[in-house]
């Protein structure tokens, strides 16, 4: 599993360089991130080529009509809006990448140091990272298969370049969300280690019998020192999370909009297939099935992304609950140990871990449920409008 994870991370780095999202170089031997002229030229060239091809595509015949002879005006409108928002969102994400390049370099180096100091965090997030890479690989592969199959009778070099430009947008989105996912998973792994150590301290503190002896005082001082180190590590970790959220907040807002519209468009597309039948030129049923499987993996990918954040918030809440067990300690413990527990708990109350994005929304299960409810409502309204008017 460790070798598989290392392979996934290397592929992600290569994919990030290929799409220009990672506009700096990482020394694979030392892990140090550096801004170089070569990395800058590669990223700039890739982005200029992608947007030049997209600009050329907007001047050509609608891709929807080319792919599907039954396309109506609603299909044109829906997929035009989705494509437009996707281009704008990707453009804003890349602007954020370039304007904050030094910030992302410092952020990457911070996570590199976090891993070097705590290599055990990988065992708590290895499986989730590999699962994420599997879902992304499947969605992108199925996306390519379905797109090429629909265009197989009209495929040319020019059209292939246009398709590549469109698929590059999806690749850029996946690279960014995967980076955020891996970073969040690493933080979650570090929280798991801190909670494990904190649980041990709480258990030992509960077993203490106050007697004022030298051994008792020494034991309390030893536990207080360990607890102070955990409190310092948690404070540094929460600061890292805040820096991560600040750097990614613009990109995450764009990604949420993109995911929302993609889910809406895909659900409407599946309805249209069931209503109007296969695409033009007697498209094989297997391609329709690939589209359905793609939608399933896309939903699973969204679910994995959401629960990665939920588990991080749960890990923080678990730390708060562990500290609340201090009320069960026997009276008469060492004053310093009690004060360290109190200060740690008060600090978590004053500075709760909350992931805000421009003040627009806060990550959490309630927010995700509201987004899902809104997505379901808008999908049904779109389908209802199609049924009534076409």
Swiss-Prot record:
Gene Ontology cellular component list: axon; dendrite; membrane; neuronal cell body; plasma membrane
Residues that span the membrane, as ranges: 39-59, 76-96, 129-149, 157-177, 253-273, 284-304, 367-383
GO biological process, one term: signal transduction
Keyword Lyase found: no
Expressing tissues: Expressed in the adult labellar chemosensory neurons. In larvae, is expressed in neurons of the terminal external chemosensory organ as well as in the dorsal pharyngeal sense organ.
Keywords: Cell membrane, Membrane, Receptor, Transducer, Transmembrane, Transmembrane helix
Pfam families given in the database record: 7tm_7
Membrane topology: Multi-pass membrane protein
Extracellular side: 60-75, 150-156, 274-283, 384-390
Major location (coarse): membrane
MF terms (GO), sorted A to Z: ligand-gated monoatomic ion channel activity; taste receptor activity
Superkingdom, natural source: Eukaryota
Subcellular localization, as worded in the UniProt entry: Cell membrane
Cytoplasmic-facing ranges: 1-38, 97-128, 178-252, 305-366
Purpose: Probable gustatory receptor which mediates acceptance or avoidance behavior, depending on its substrates.
Family as reported in the entry's similarity comment: Belongs to the insect chemoreceptor superfamily. Gustatory receptor (GR) family. Gr22e subfamily.
Name assigned to this protein: Putative gustatory receptor 59d
